[in-house]
Amino acid sequence: MDPQTLITKANKVSYYGNPTSKESWRYDWYQPSKVSSNVQQPQQQLGDMENNLEKYPFRYKTWLRNQEDEKNLQRESCEDILDLKEFDRRILKKSLMTSHTKGDTSKATGAPSANQGDEALSVDDIRGAVGNSEAIPGLSAGVNNDNTKESKDVKMN
């Protein structure tokens, strides 16, 4: 079989499929019917046959194809339709953007400056909480680490 034919068959209901074939689905409870080996009478209608079928005693949720028209569903149940633009994580909301850009920041580091007001922490506040760079050994530029070299040279008896 031609590879293009395989791709076309695989994509029948996907993005590349026929744009005119619209199907609507709903996530609902489903109770499967037991399959009987008895041959049904040919005069029986399909609806009657569904009503007479014996059902299994369990149900599960699954995606079911809607038999109703999609337009009728939209008119009846507006609360189930979500606007996906409201939940798009790529779009920042204005309220979030204003909270991050409220204070002035240092141009070089992007950290909030010490003269910022209200709720944001300044660089001095953060340094005070974790200790200055002198409080952490090895991070201070003025400290010389010659003591470690001397201790390595001492021989044990």
From Swiss-Prot:
Q: Where is this region: Disordered?
A: 95-157
Q: What is this protein called?
A: Regulator of Ty1 transposition protein 102
Say which species the protein is native to: Saccharomyces cerevisiae (strain ATCC 204508 / S288c) (Baker's yeast)
Q: What is a single molecular function from GO for this protein?
A: DNA translocase activity
Protein's job: Probable component of the chromatin structure-remodeling complex (RSC) which is involved in transcription regulation and nucleosome positioning. RSC is responsible for the transfer of a histone octamer from a nucleosome core particle to naked DNA. The reaction requires ATP and involves an activated RSC-nucleosome intermediate. Remodeling reaction also involves DNA translocation, DNA twist and conformational change.
For this UniProt record, the keywords arranged alphabetically read as follows: Nucleus, Phosphoprotein, Transcription, Transcription regulation
GO terms for CC?
chromatin; nucleus; RSC-type complex; SWI/SNF complex
Describe, as the record does, how this protein assembles with itself and its partners: Interacts with STH1 and SWI3. Component of the two forms of the RSC complex composed of at least either RSC1 or RSC2, and ARP7, ARP9, LDB7, NPL6, RSC3, RSC30, RSC4, RSC58, RSC6, RSC8, RSC9, SFH1, STH1, HTL1 and probably RTT102. The complexes interact with histone and histone variant components of centromeric chromatin. Probable additional component of the SWI/SNF global transcription activator complex.
Subcellular location per UniProt equals: Nucleus
Q: Biased composition, Polar residues: where in the chain?
A: 96-116
